[in-house]
Amino acid sequence: MQSQFDKICKFKKFYKNDENEKYNIFVIPIFYYDKYRRLGPKGVYKNKSEERQLAFIRNLKANIENLHNGNIPSNWKFRIYYDKSLTNFEYEGVKVWNKLFSVISKSNKIQLIRFKCSRYYSCKKHCKLFGTLIRFHPLYIKEKNVISVNCIDSDNYISTKRLNELIKFIDSKYDINVFCSKYEFPRYKDLSRKDNFECYFRAGLISSKISFGEKKWDEAFADIDNPKSNFTKSFNNIIKHLKVFFPDEIQNKDNLYFEFGFDEIFLNYFIKNIIYKEKYKVRYVHYQPSYT
């Protein structure tokens, strides 16, 4: 039976699987958001859309080079979820994503999937940073070829240290792996809710060897769309503490749904709930938080 989410979201795969192949996937979402504003020096906001796109391209190229010629084991692949907004980005007169995809699509280690979610789509692009949530989609679907799903940020380079920890996780008894710090402020977490975990989860630093199930994915988006859901109440609590601790971040924003940090709100609410209720075993890799 088709999930409710898949009725409003279309995924077009540009790769084929070997039926007997088993592999691990790094998952990244890539899209173009032309209003990616971040607070800079002296409290001045700057549009960093172009800067972010160039960082995505630079790190993706480095990761793919490492995948083919570096220390990433042969049973790993990159899965890239993207939407048509990338065609809106040009740099020095070149549609760089079209050029890059035409090259990497020939590799059997790259899985390109184009997505379009009609409910969250208008004017040739998805709502704000909605695309960041799509990286979690493989956590909820069962794929017989996939050993583990490893969510990363689009501008992250897979370091040797991180890769070694993921390899340890795959060979371990644990279901979930997270890189986190006990000392990091839970910026996008509801501080009024009890948390049974050692630390705040980051959206680009979680891995899983189990599938949460498509029903849970549907339920999450039903709650997101419901103004009276417990999630909405929790989200409003987060906005309240952002107004206290990070007022500059939310100024001049009338609707914070799918804004920066929404993927971590999703992770620390929905995915943590599943892990806790199902009693999945979590492996923690602690690191020193960055305050820059």
Please state what every model-predicted region is.
Residues 203-292:
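Catalytic core and acceptor-binding pocket of nucleotide-sugar-dependent glycosyltransferases
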Residues 31-35, 85-87, 117-120, 156-159, ...:
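Short, solvent-exposed loop/turn segments at secondary-structure junctions
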Residues 58-69, 137-141, 265-273:
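Short, hydrophobic/amphipathic alpha-helical patches that form generic packing surfaces
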Residues 135, 152, 201-202, 263:
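Residues that flank catalytic or metal-binding motifs in active/ligand-binding sites
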Residues 112-114, 128-184:
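GT-A fold catalytic core of metal-dependent nucleotide-sugar glycosyltransferases
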Residues 1-121:
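N-terminal anchoring/stem segment of glycosyltransferases
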Residues 173-210:
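Short beta-strand-to-loop element that shapes/binds the nucleotide-sugar donor at the catalytic cleft/hinge
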